């Protein structure tokens, strides 16, 4: 109550910010007359003037009014588009590293030009991030005219580009690309063996378009570069026979033994999408597997030798009970293709992990492809948090404002519309069954069609869009279906979705990024006429005028019919996705309307609100075909959506907390990897490693401060001879001296190791040997880091079980992850020292050959896949990765390498700073020991 009272007096935080930015808008507008009088050359010359002022120490904030005024004037001259005042406010929000929520049709692409131009003046690069290649290319080509006019270079970063093209794109002042491509380039840069092979610069400033889609919807899905693993095809086929023989248990057993309606072998948790074997299920599975010869008679599934089988049992169960054809995946050309649950898009090239994809392939009786091992991976949460400054734009961010602030430290500012919105959002209509719902949808579409009103129908899945298309065909209503398979065709259809009588069915976010203009898109057709060289100039002008006149008539006709009508056939579990669908209507003050049609069979209603609404319908004795349309029901649904959103936020936050553990370790490893790449001479590092390893070996047999009776000299001699190529007569030294100490033995062994090392260096020369050492070190760090991440992954999969032992799983994970990391650092030192001390070299040529073999072995990318939503594997630049990066590994290099690493991009850890691993020690006394 107090908050509401204070808001009335002082306004909300959002209103105060907008008011504050409005003052700067007035300053920019005051400069307009002065800037308008400049010639094109003088306007272009402003860019050089600004650059010099920035180089002299002037801040970008101080430069903002002038830079925005120049950019607006250039846009007016080049693009024939002048930024509105609210667009200037949007530009300021982005420049100050916040999220701008702008309604559909308010010109987000144009808004981005203001902060992008201003920040590009610093010369450190600006990334404009979009959701697909089509939008990246469209926006880059469209806005490049403006940036080039102002003297700035523009690059496009697309999948499938050559290595040199990528380097050129990143060297530009402004780089357009997709979130996936920026992330994958980052990972590939972390797998290089030469600094020249990198493509990215330091991560400076990113403007993310459709920021909610990238930073929230896709936050739970990491980018993964993977290679082929061991083949378990036969096992998946045999396990596929198990789920049909098991029965589902209905009801959960309570403490008093009640609650089970029907006993069975497994239980399903639809909310968390998990399946669990019951006690009887375990016994039945063990009996069946023993009959099939997969485990020994009377053996438990949890016996050490059978633990891997459990993984296959659960993968098969999940494939049969939680993943459905035409809802979660489709079978296309003999392959299982995932359907994105948020967008309804087919995601060719993306595969489920943990053997689930292979289990689904076995279920559908298609060819089972080999399991993959992760070679490199990063989440968008950790990638985008590495930019020095991050900003985003979307039509719907306010519902997720808390998460943006909590996870990314980004404030959301709602930008006022240029014209007041006129869209009418009608109340939801809820029917008992899906059939009644679809009948009502068809009736509504027919009414719109008859009065010439365009309709956009949003569905949550491909299956539903095809069902609706079938019903519309039966009703004799012509329509277009968008299943989000081809972005360019998608954009063309969506652009024409505002024509009279046009019916368009689209999965939730198909065609996002393209405006629906009432009356159709005359500009595109005019561009085709303009580009046709066969048409004379006067004829072109006549045709374009005729086109615009026709559009004007159609535009008014559609406005009179009520504008674009949006129909939602189901509520999404996120209010934001529903708002995105609604937001397609009523752009820039146009009329429009929206309505959602629901049924009690919808997953959201069934799981969260079904019983309550059904009891209301039963009490009201609703006849068949009659709908409930009441505020209380709509509020009940929104309450259910809020519950789901809160649960999803908790999941994402928890994932991030776990991922932060490996992320902190990454910072250490990749900082050291970069220092290795950039160091001219790593002799000191190798020497420190050698001394550390030799000390450990000697102390194992001759403990510090011990007496002769406690020593095991023969074993020490054998260990040094077999493992370290050091043939020393230590027993003779002990026999000859009555007062020799443990420290003197250590000194003798260390001196011998140093002499052996120096002899090898003298044989081939310091430069050649350093190159060999660097290759050994990089290959060893990469391989053991991947194995470490695989170990972390296995640790994480079972860590929740510690909760049953009254232990905090997160704390346990941090503790054990730290122990694993310390063990990995020791293993790196041991491995590198062993290779360097054991290598037998006669000439520099031999050494060069050995270094090449190491790099070739680690640089051989076999059957590499790039996995993430919307990232087609066929477009991934596999060949040029192998050529350009000479990195990564074959299948014998297990595990994964997460995150980035260019010297300037990860925060430097000072020697006396606290170690990022969380041990509480200084970095130099903890993980800094490696370097």
UniProtKB/Swiss-Prot annotation:
GO terms for cellular component: cell envelope Sec protein transport complex; cytosol; plasma membrane
PROSITE patterns: SECA, SECA_MOTOR_DEAD
Binding note for cofactor: May bind 1 zinc ion per subunit.
EC number of the protein: 7.4.2.8
Binding site for ATP: 87, 105-109, 515
Cofactor section: Zn(2+)
Key words of the record: ATP-binding, Cell inner membrane, Cell membrane, Cytoplasm, Membrane, Metal-binding, Nucleotide-binding, Protein transport, Translocase, Translocation, Transport, Zinc
TM region(s), chain numbering: none
Any one GO MF annotation of this record: ATP binding
One Pfam match: SecA_PP_bind
Catalytic activity from the UniProt record: ATP + H2O + cellular proteinSide 1 = ADP + phosphate + cellular proteinSide 2
BP GO terms, sorted: intracellular protein transmembrane transport; protein import; protein targeting; protein transport by the Sec complex
Localisation per UniProt entry: Cell inner membrane; Cytoplasm
Main localization category: membrane
Quaternary structure (record): Monomer and homodimer. Part of the essential Sec protein translocation apparatus which comprises SecA, SecYEG and auxiliary proteins SecDF-YajC and YidC.
Family statement drawn from the similarity comment of this UniProt entry: Belongs to the SecA family.
Stated role: Part of the Sec protein translocase complex. Interacts with the SecYEG preprotein conducting channel. Has a central role in coupling the hydrolysis of ATP to the transfer of proteins into and across the cell membrane, serving both as a receptor for the preprotein-SecB complex and as an ATP-driven molecular motor driving the stepwise translocation of polypeptide chains across the membrane.
HAMAP family, A to Z: SecA
Name under which the protein is recorded: Protein translocase subunit SecA
Gene that this sequence comes from: secA
